A protein has these predicted regions:
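Active-site-proximal specificity loops/subdomain of glycosyltransferases
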Residues: 35-72
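Short, surface-exposed amphipathic charged segments that create phosphate/polyanion-binding patches used
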Residues: 49-57, 119-124, 189-192
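Conserved catalytic core of nucleotide-sugar-dependent glycosyltransferases
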Residues: 98-160
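A glycosyltransferase accessory/donor-loop signature
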Residues: 2-14, 20, 30-32, 38-45, ...
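GT-A fold catalytic core of metal-dependent nucleotide-sugar glycosyltransferases
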Residues: 65-114, 138
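Alpha-helix N-cap/loop-to-helix initiation residues
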Residues: 15-16, 88
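Zn2+-dependent metallopeptidase catalytic core
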Residues: 23, 27
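Short, solvent-exposed loop/edge-beta patches enriched in aromatic
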Residues: 2-3, 29-33, 72-80
């Protein structure tokens, strides 16, 4: 029996449009069934799963809730986490198929050193090693047991995002770069074949960034229009 691919999406209330367009793009391009779960912070708080105070340095509501995924999976099997400010253009099953039991986590291993200090809506842009690695993760949940509820709610942001909960970097595997192409950060030429776009600096769903990424912004609006097109 083929089980749906479990996908968890980090959601910020200011990015509802981005979230819904991402969800539509995922299942429109997928060759396999998907089980998509948006991570809604108030829901996690109401269930007693998340209680940490908001960090002034966190730019989104899901900065730390992403690390609850192994717990939500019962520390069994694999799952995908992704930020909501993305757009799928390729078959997410192809990413799912690169799972490797040798690793606890697999991700695109960017060398992203921000040149700016502020990003979308005036949020602080933080610079740290492994920047953006945690924005798209294949999680081997049985090997992520250190991510207990207490740890996720008390560890520092750097401990979480720099994967200090693993024994070492040897437990982090790579996936092809196109599965987390950073719009307006990485070489635009690489975007053409990228199966997953990521507006990490803020996307066209924000008024001040309607054209972020140029033609890629237009592509996002096309995807939005298709997702919400009424049947004639």
């Amino acid at each position: 029996m083929t089980h749906p691919i479990p996908i968890f999406i980090g959601v910020d209330p200011r990015e509802r449009a981005a979230t819904n367009v991402l969800i539509d793009s995922l299942y429109q391009h997928s060759s396999k069934p998907l089980a998509i779960t948006p991570l809604i912070t108030p829901q996690l708080e109401a269930q007693g799963l998340y209680w940490r105070a908001r960090d002034p340095k966190q730019s989104t509501a899901f900065s730390f809730t992403r690390f609850l995924v192994p717990h939500l999976m019962g520390y069994e099997g694999w799952a995908i986490f992704m930020d909501c400010d993305m757009l799928a253009r390729g078959d997410i099953a192809e990413l799912w198929n690169v799972r490797n039991e040798s690793f606890a986590v697999q991700c695109v291993q960017h060398e992203h050193i921000p040149g700016e200090t502020v990003k979308f809506l005036g949020e602080v842009q933080s610079a740290y090693p492994k920047k953006n690695w945690s924005s798209l993760m294949l999680l081997n949940c049985s090997r992520c047991t250190k991510l207990s509820l207490d740890y996720v709610n008390t560890a520092t942001g750097l401990e979480l995002h720099r994967f200090h909960w693993l024994e070492g970097d040897h437990q982090i595997g790579a996936v092809p770069d196109g599965w987390n192409h950073l719009v307006a950060v990485q070489n635009p030429a690489k975007a053409e074949a990228a199966p997953l776009l990521h507006w990490t600096l803020g996307g066209p769903w924000f008024k001040a960034q309607r054209t972020m990424g140029g033609e890629l912004a237009a592509e996002w609006f096309t995807a939005r229009d298709e997702a919400f097109r009424l049947y004639e």
